[in-house]
Amino acid sequence: MADMRTRWILGFVGSATVAIVAVAAAQGRSEAPAPGGDSIQPDDLQADVSFLAGDKMQGRRTGTPGNRQAAEFIASRFGRSGLTAVGVNGSYFQPFDLMTATLGESNRIEVSGVPAVDLTFGTTYYPDPTSGTGTASGDVVFAGFGIRADALDHNDYRSSFALDGKVALILNHEPGEFDAGSPFDGAIASEHARVVRKVLAAQTAGATAVLIAPDMHNHEGPRGTTRPRRSVWPERPPRRPRYQVAGWVRDVAIPVVQISGDLAARMVENAGLTMRELAGAGAERVGGIAAVPLPEQHVELTTSVHRRFHPNRNVVGLIEGEDPVLRDEWILITAHYDHEGADGTRVFNGADDNASGVAGLIEIAEAYRLAGLDGLRPRRSVLLAAWNSEEQGLLGAWSYTANPIHPLGQTVAVLNMDMIGRDEEIPDGGGARFYGLTAQTAASNRNAVNVLGYSRSPDLKRAAERANRVTGLTLRFRYDNNASNLLRRSDQWPFLHEGVPALFIHTGLHPDYHTERDRPDTVNYGKMARVVQMVHALSWNLAQSPTRPAYLSR
């Protein structure tokens, strides 16, 4: 409540907004807020967003002073609300490393039966950024998409011969890429298509090196490399570093080289086969391909990739449960605090994306503190986590799932808030940012919030519907299997990938998304307060429930 803590005073505008949301909430509310939930008010949220998304923070990009300052601010607010510090050395920080790669000088490839003049660096081949540095050689084996997915009973390395000492030729992407019924998440690329996962599977199977060719079965067009060399290895250092999770790449010790479709076809044809035959009927086979040796195709290659490691951190704080048994089961409430940084005179403030979600975390922490003052505590423990490096590929959340503070098997649910302060507005013909989304106006979404992850846990969907009785929002359960791939574009995805029930709370994209126009004065703080109250109520209900939500694999 206002008189129980220090808060920034925003004057008449904040007071008026409080009045508006109070009326709106009263109109749609059929249940009282969860304990402490009445403290979640627009003026406090506005103060938090205004600080996090102010120009002085310079867009909070990973690795910048503004990003580090944001982390310190969140930690200080967690401390003020009495959260238990469960990070490293009794702090609120969970450290993790990211990696960037630069191209070295010595990179070459020699393929038997292919003249050296045809092997042009940057056009015919180049090292992948995941590559180890070193020299390797071996006979070539075609191994389909290079996927081993035991849960799907798919293994492209099942074979009667050993891969030891061989060079694996694999395709990028995955089987059934445009098949809605594919076990690999239908027509949306799954985690099994990630290059580093394929490389580690090949390395474990004994490969000395990996060659990655374009998937010509599913993708017609130029037969060059998967991506132009300049898009992977720009001639000048990129303005914004390209990060990877260090824990993934650190284990890669073998050379990894992207090659052109033409080179792959030449190698296969020299062995008396055809690439389309292998890529189609072979690689697309259910359960994986029986790896195919390519007779008389021998490769020698050298790669030089310099790795640099960068320390980063998530911010974590715990509300300890009071039940002696259930306290070992955790609810996670999460939001990412990084954004896109600054570009010359432009600052990408990231007010909605995602100062809004972080402000929600901060005010939920305070709501739990106030409930505790009234003697009300959750039965299960609740971890509040602010992830870093979401904009670089959910890297903070991936790092957590690789090294969780608490076992994922004892994580009951994850509630992720990302962009919770606007009305969804999809312009007609809006371009790549809005791919797969139907044109709609902001006015049609005034009271709406998207909830994703529902298809993986009907129990969690029902819990969200119950929690919404507190606020009367319009919950839209859509986009789980949409071509926009939204379900996989925020920090709930690493948890869903690990089988943990998770919801993505998201008021939707809009024309200011990832532009310098995403500023604090564009956020609807009244609506945002209701969204945060709903998430708080949902977390409280889950923490008190005698049962935990089930997870359904796709």
Regions found by a protein language model. Name each.
Residues A365-G393, M417, R422:
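Short helix-loop-beta-strand segments that form the rim/entrance of peptidase-like active sites
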Residues E31-S39, D55-P65, D97, N107, ...:
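Second-shell loop/turn segments in exported
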Residues L119-W248, V252-P255, E320, R346-F348, ...:
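Extracellular/luminal Protease-associated
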Residues P33, S112, T120-S160, G247-G350, ...:
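Soluble metallo-hydrolase cores and metallopeptidase-like ectodomains found primarily
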Residues A26-A85, L263-R266, D328-W330, L552:
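N-terminal hydrophobic or amphipathic helices/low-complexity stretches enriched
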Residues E366, H506, H510-R554:
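His/Asp/Glu-rich mid-to-C-terminal helical/loop segments that flank catalytic regions of hydrolases
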Residues Q58-G181, P295-E296, V305-R307, P311-N314:
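Noncatalytic luminal/extracellular "stalk/propeptide" segments of secretory-pathway proteins
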Residues A116-T120, G132-T133, Q244-E277, W387-F504:
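Metal-dependent peptidase/peptidase-like ectodomains
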